[in-house]
């Protein structure tokens, strides 16, 4: 027994000594890599002597005369200088997403003198984009955003199979997209190809920014920067993801984040190799209406069990190429919680035929029968609304439905206090039509209102207006504001 304990103690001592030796070797490797990076940076330095750099007796310069004029005020910044400007000119930056983030990022990177900019975006320009996507103009509505932003690039859709072939030709990647599945794909590809990634997002009045996979160490090297999966191992619930179209966005907010992305890209391009311990990864949070508007949260290092950057990674270039990694399945698809039967839905055109005197037409009036409930939030209801419609936000309806579900199953459900008197009346059987912006929330609201007993056990019709106010504009009122 005593011999076994001595053996165990000896093994522990050997392990500790080996780990200490390994830590020392890692430190030596980091110093060597830093020195190699410095030598490489020195190798790119361009020195022109009095006798050199002359053609036919005329002195030549590393930049064109126009470039000195254009970038002069940038080059006198110590962190950039001539060598930084030369690095920018030789850099290749890929921007995925030519929207609210990608437009200002591309604008400022091009203005800074980045030699090659690549854009990937499959969307077309819409009028609703113009207040924040500063590369697009009214004349380009309907064109692909890539064609609008930079004429010589063709439209491209990013898929797992083609992402590596697109990314490999660039030095740094900017994620300017707005959906989780694409974000995970971009991050995975950047890690597997050893590319730094500048990722940003913006919604309403807030934004976030991260520099990921920086320094871009090999898969399994814990000294490398974390990836998107390290920060968010699990994607958000699909139904919780809110787009700018649904949640809204202030142009200057997304512009701020795009400009910051461009700034971080310039820093990565012009700076020497980063020391992970000296520059820990962080998440920058911007809130336009907070004081102060900026704050920083330190991020953890690479996760030991990360699916893409750990030693036991399950996501590889091979899995991307064969398409075995299903990013849409991984992130989930937001499904409609309560799809109604055809009998519970009515088109705007059919509603006008069924109630010709009640439905407003071209500035006409509407009586209180039938009742139209608009379930958009108040800020949207105030933008435009059907005359005499009642605003009951979907959030209010869902909150009441949740309380009803937690009540005694044997008790008679009580109607909520926010219901208008005519709807809460026990004698009222007037039909209720629910409308929202696109026809999705209205279906959920109909289900909840029936759970609350508004249909009087089937005696009162409760249904939704199919297609929402967008369909109303298409079928009834072409002058209806589209936002």
Curated annotation (Swiss-Prot):
Which InterPro entries does its entry note? MOCS3/Uba4, Rhodanese-like_dom, Rhodanese-like_dom_sf, ThiF/MoeB/HesA, ThiF_NAD_FAD-bd, Ubiquitin-activating_enz
Residues involved in Zn(2+) binding:
227, 230, 306, 309
Please give the GO cellular component terms listed in this UniProt entry: cytosol
The name on file for this protein is Adenylyltransferase and sulfurtransferase uba4
Function of the molecule: Plays a central role in 2-thiolation of mcm(5)S(2)U at tRNA wobble positions of cytosolic tRNA(Lys), tRNA(Glu) and tRNA(Gln). Also essential during biosynthesis of the molybdenum cofactor. Acts by mediating the C-terminal thiocarboxylation of sulfur carriers urm1 and mocs2a. Its N-terminus first activates urm1 and mocs2a as acyl-adenylates (-COAMP), then the persulfide sulfur on the catalytic cysteine is transferred to urm1 and mocs2a to form thiocarboxylation (-COSH) of their C-terminus.
Taxonomy of origin reads:
Eukaryota, Fungi, Dikarya, Ascomycota, Pezizomycotina
Which residues act catalytically here?
A: 244 (glycyl thioester intermediate), 436 (cysteine persulfide intermediate)
Cofactor(s) in the UniProt record: Zn(2+)
PANTHER family referenced in this protein's UniProt entry, alphabetically: ADENYLYLTRANSFERASE AND SULFURTRANSFERASE MOCS3, UBIQUITIN-ACTIVATING ENZYME E1
Q: What is its EC number?
A: 2.7.7.80, 2.8.1.11
Instruction: Name the UniProt key words of this record, in alphabetical order.
Output: ATP-binding, Cytoplasm, Metal-binding, Molybdenum cofactor biosynthesis, Multifunctional enzyme, Nucleotide-binding, Nucleotidyltransferase, Transferase, tRNA processing, Ubl conjugation pathway, Zinc
What is the source species?
Neosartorya fischeri (strain ATCC 1020 / DSM 3700 / CBS 544.65 / FGSC A1164 / JCM 1740 / NRRL 181 / WB 181)
* Name of one Pfam family that matches: ThiF
Report the family membership: In the N-terminal section; belongs to the HesA/MoeB/ThiF family. UBA4 subfamily.
């Amino acid at each position: 027994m005593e011999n076994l304990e001595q053996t165990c103690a000896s093994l522990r001592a050997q392990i500790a000594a080996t780990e200490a030796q390994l830590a020392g070797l890692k430190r030596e490797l980091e110093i060597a890599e830093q020195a190699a990076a410095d030598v490489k940076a020195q190798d790119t330095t361009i020195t022109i002597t009095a006798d050199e750099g002359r053609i036919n007796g005329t002195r030549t310069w590393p930049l064109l005369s126009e470039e000195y004029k254009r970038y002069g005020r940038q080059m006198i910044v110590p962190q950039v200088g001539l060598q930084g400007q030369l690095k920018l000119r030789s850099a290749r930056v890929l921007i995925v997403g030519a929207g609210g983030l990608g437009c200002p990022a591309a604008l400022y990177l091009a203005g800074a003198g980045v030699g090659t900019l690549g854009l990937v975006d499959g969307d077309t320009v819409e009028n609703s984009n113009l207040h924040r996507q500063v590369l697009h103009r009214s004349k380009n509505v309907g064109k692909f955003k890539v064609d609008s932003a930079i004429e010589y690039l063709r439209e491209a859709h990013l898929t797992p199979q083609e992402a590596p072939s697109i990314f490999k030709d660039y030095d740094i990647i900017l994620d300017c997209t707005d959906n989780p599945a694409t974000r995970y794909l971009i991050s995975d590809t950047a890690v597997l190809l050893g590319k730094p990634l500048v990722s940003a997002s913006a919604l309403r009045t807030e934004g976030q920014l991260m520099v990921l996979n920086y320094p871009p160490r090999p898969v399994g090297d814990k000294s490398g920067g974390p990836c998107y999966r390290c920060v968010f191992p699990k994607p958000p619930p699909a139904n919780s993801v809110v787009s700018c179209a649904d949640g809204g966005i202030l142009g200057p907010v997304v512009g701020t984040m795009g400009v910051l992305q461009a700034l971080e890209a310039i820093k990565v391009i012009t700076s020497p190799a980063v020391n992970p311990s000296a520059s820990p990864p962080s998440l920058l949070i911007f809130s336009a209406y907070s004081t102060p508007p900026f704050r920083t949260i330190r991020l953890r290092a690479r996760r030991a069990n990360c699916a893409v950057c750990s030693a036991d990674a399950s996501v590889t270039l091979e899995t991307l190429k064969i398409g075995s990694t299903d990013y849409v399945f991984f992130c989930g698809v937001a499904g409609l919680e309560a799809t109604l039967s055809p009998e519970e839905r009515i088109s705007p055109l059919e509603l006008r035929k069924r109630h010709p005197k009640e439905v407003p037409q071209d500035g006409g009036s509407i009586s209180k029968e039938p009742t139209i409930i608009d379930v958009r939030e108040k800020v949207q209801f105030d933008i435009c609304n059907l005359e005499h419609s009642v605003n009951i936000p979907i959030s209010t309806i869902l909150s009441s439905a949740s309380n009803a579900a937690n009540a005694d199953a044997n008790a008679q459900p009580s109607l909520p206090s926010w219901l208008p008197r005519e709807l809460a009346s026990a004698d009222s059987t007037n039909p209720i039509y629910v409308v929202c912006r696109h026809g999705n929330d209205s279906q959920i609201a109909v289900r909840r209102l029936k759970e609350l007993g508004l249909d009087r056990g089937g005696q009162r019709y409760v249904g939704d207006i199919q297609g929402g106010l967008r369909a109303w504009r298409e079928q009834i009122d072409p002058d209806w504001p589209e936002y």
